[in-house]
């Protein structure tokens, strides 16, 4: 590497996408004389306040970080309940601390090729043609390529009147009881038998054993709510579903995920690539991101390694296909125009669509046949009407 550069690649942010890309670069054969620097504003990297969940549909580098698998998944709507499973498919979770532990172990074994710079904030990136200037709170760093995983501000969904902009926001707690009250093999993905007064709302439950579970209150609305709203919803759900049971709170977690039809500018300049949420790797209609990030870095990392060998640029693969963008646009447009229909619509999806097909659809790994099955067996007439209403959006998103 030429002395004029502080790094071959600088990654702004050491979260899910930043660490996943760094690991993927090693797997792709990052040269021994190359240098990758991850810059993160946190003093200590820890994922104790988050988990990533997904259907285990594609292989990835963090299989050993999976701590729980559920062979069945449930959706409730009022008194109605649908319970589903699919051969060879589980719903999985990776706790944030396990992900960080595994990723950091891999990076530490890479020696001088990987460096973590903590307690430093990346302020902005400037493509200078032959290199990138990374402006930070500690000064300017120079790199051949820069990857920007800094998430957008999500205190409120922007609304320009054209695109659909919602937020998936949640707060949850891990609770434990002395009594065995949870079904350890069944994840409750959506329980809509809760108040809908503040917008589309459901409870999400991941039992880790018969005594312990993560219980989250989740909303699809334009802005997050006070913590007390989520906490009250969890208390109400626990009291109604498990009356008389005393719970101890072990930990809390919260988050905000964009659900938007706005396009993401993932390649703002030849030497700067946006990744993760900033790169559009979150599926707008479901909020799932883990598998999308893993698919992206697995395809992108070899391009970066090849670019470094010739001092070139690396074009990122498309985060999502035109087909899936179109389907999410229709679905989000429908949720915006008919939020009161959301519980029935989601319930029908899980009730009518074959579980393996729906798992692939929700994870953006489905085929055209899968997508047609979902459209044909879901709330078809209303979604067809929404497709007509969303036509101007579709033209802008898919051209």
Annotate the PLM regions.
Residues 2-17, 37:
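Beta1/beta-strand and adjacent pyrophosphate-binding region of the FAD-binding site
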Residues 197-200, 255-275, 284, 334-340, ...:
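FAD-binding beta-loop-beta segment adjacent to the flavin cofactor pocket
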Residues 56-119, 123-130:
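A conserved beta-strand/loop capping segment in the N-terminal third of enzymes
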Residues 20, 24-80:
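N-terminal FAD cofactor-binding segment of flavoenzymes
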